[in-house]
Amino acid sequence: MKTEFGFSNLVGTIFSKGNLVFTPDGFSILSPVGNRVSVYNLKDNTSYTFPFENHKNISHIALSPTSTLLLSVDEEGRCILCNFLRRSVLHYFNFKSPVGAIEFSPNGKFFAVSLGKLIQVWRTPNSLEEREFAPFVLHREYTGHFDDIVSISWSADSRFFISTSKDLTARLHSVDPIEGFHPCALTGHKNTVVSGFFSKDQQTIYTVSKDGALFVWKYSPLFQAGEVIDEEAEENKTRTHIWLIKERHYFNQNSKLRCAAFHPTSNLLVVGFSSGLFGIYELPSFTMLYQLSITQSNIDTLTVNSTGDWIAIGSSKLGQLLVWEWQSESYVLKQQSHYDALSTLQYSSDGQRIITGADDGKIKVWDMNSGFCIVTFTQHTSAVSGLCFSKRGNVLFSSSLDGSVRAWDLIRYRNFRTFTAPSRVQFSCIAVDPSGEIVCAGSQDSFEIFMWSVQTGQLLETLAGHEGPVSSLSFNSSGSLLASGSWDKTVRIWDIFSRSGIVEPLPIPSDVLSLAFHPDGKEVCVASLDGQLTFWNVQEGKQTSLIDGRKDLSGGRRFDDARTAENSSLNKTFTSICYSADGSCVLSAGTSKYVCLYDIITGVLIKKFQLSKNESLQGVQEMLNSRKMTEAGSIELIDTQGEESDLEDRIDRTLPGARRGDLSARKTRPEIICHGVQFSPSGGAFAAATTEGLMIYSLYNDFLFDPINLDMDITPSTTLTMCAEGEFLISLVMALRLNEYKVVQKVYESIPITDVEHVVQELPVSYLANFMGYLSSFAAETPHIEFHLRWMKSVLTYHGEYLRRKNFEFASQLTSLQKSIVVLSKRLSQLSSNNEFQLSFLLDKMHLRLENTA
């Protein structure tokens, strides 16, 4: 199997902290998710996440007006400049101080960044005008504020900008010195000035403060100021105008104003409050157009798209991201992350959806094509401990610590069956037989396994024998054997349909944390507390091999660790394992920042994937900074929330003894942990449920250059030349040896349909797996339905016997072909239904007209 997996997308986390940014076309929105940036296309209903990572959680992002450059800045001021279209990093830069705000100028030539009390304006990298060796060139620095700057707003002509600060003032600056212009301070607010904006004609400035006050400033002649500015006029006779407060407005809300956004073209002001309320006002009349409460927590950021129709709202506490169309009063996007950590995940049988369960008791269904949450189930009242699909994939089973096992219909999105035990127990794991008729759940209280009938909902049997909490359950492929692992250091294989109740336990050196059956059902892999993976022959009850993965998990230190990263493997274990589709490899993850892929036959580590480089999480850094260690411990763990300026931020709502959730320590640094890992049914991707969300890793066929038996005379040009000369088989083999996606597609589509059977019949089997992978991709992307089906039929006809004998080796390719056929079937059936309805409508119209004429 291929192992060139790379980061593909991050779902499950919609918004973490920072600011939201619309693209200039107004159809896509950029959202910071931890130390990454996700892009949600609201028009095409798709999403993706940039592959680069900041050192820590992102605090600010900015997009150039041409949508070519993206700046992302983390909490410590480290900046990444990337090409937005190519998704590639261009430059790393360190501002050496936390950034309060960063904004591109409307003409795209500059960007302004606030560093404490200081503002720096930098030239935007541009290779067309002034070629510079340095990516960032400092243009000017601006001072004048006496406290941290919180926002920057540019004028439409990019000549001026407004900065607002915690010193209760806003200041007006010019990018370049202008004759007759003097930087001025706009004073009068009684609290932090949150934002300042220019009107469309730039003759009016609006400033909004944290206490809910809106000041309207007008550019007035100096003589109207009277005697107050006579002394200043004598000192500087070049000043002829001054900014004066013309109007004062108040929002009169019993909460703090958190953020504001202004759309100059339509004169719309949008404000968000700490109570979860946001309002839309028309300026300069200060007419309230709309007011709505969307959440019970703070609104942290607001932004308006280029047309002024859509308003994006972000709340970091609940992980909410909303896009509201205020004219139609409807949601364009409404997504929310899990409130607590992910605990489990499960792929659907077609690989189109991933279901996640979390400690908040919610189950979310995520669409892999769009990256959005389709539905959320909230019936569980405690943490979700396990998820499992039936064979058909339309029924989902979940277990929870609330003592219930629930069956969900994923067509109607409802809970149609609930299974409970005779006594109150907490279920820690779940398994469903391949037929979908029997569901089993393990208990961590009574150490028993409960078995129910899905059709009747009745408890069939209780399997007893374990002497510790049952940690994992798994059925084999035939459904006759059930494997159970427990903390009592044993694995038991239950033949649930036999009359004999004798079960011989398999001894494990340490507590069992997870187990999984091989796809052929003859082998079981067990992960234990000592970091080992043991493989057992189920029929003989003998251990066949062992992999010690503790050293592979080592790396990363907690902020209070006294051990080095190399010696930090004592508490690192595998908590989730999964076989590949062909059964040749096993994927394992646990209490570490790594996901390990092992070859079963040799027991060798093939590849190790690092889940995150976010140093805001514990267990990521290899080296700790001794300067951050104090007598009270690490600075990273010291609670500074009591020093906040607002009363609602200083209130201590913690509960003594709470280690997780909202009532735990006010300043928490979560640890990077993978709670679950699973391959997709096709084997072309795998998903990991981590602290930062649901991470998807897939094979990059479009960018992968993996030549097979490459010769000097095999090039794209010679390959296409051979195809043009009619040597279709030779050109196809050459394209597969090059393994370039575009070349293979060009040759594939150039072969006449009459020659398909001949080409497939003579195709060497060594290229069959690679070609089937390309065939499934072409069928899902291009509209040549009959052409693709002819290829698939020929492959299965002439190589069917070989595929049957090597079914485990080609399991992922066959699953991908089946998935492509389902996509083609849905596409064709929808088109046929539409045509049928249109023809029926036209015939009815014709009959009606004939009846009227008669």
From Swiss-Prot:
WD repeats lie at residues 9-52, 53-93, 94-132, 144-183, 188-227, 252-291, 294-334, 337-376, 379-418, 422-464, 465-504, 507-546, 569-608, 668-709. Belongs to the WD repeat PWP2 family. GO terms for cellular component: cytosol; nucleolus; Pwp2p-containing subcomplex of 90S preribosome; small-subunit processome; sno(s)RNA-containing ribonucleoprotein complex. PROSITE patterns: WD_REPEATS_1, WD_REPEATS_2, WD_REPEATS_REGION. GO terms for molecular function: snoRNA binding. Pfam families: Utp12, WD40. Keywords: Phosphoprotein, Repeat, WD repeat. The modification Phosphothreonine is found at residue 640. It comes from the Eukaryota. It comes from Schizosaccharomyces pombe (strain 972 / ATCC 24843) (Fission yeast). The modification Phosphoserine is found at residue 645. This is Periodic tryptophan protein 2 homolog.
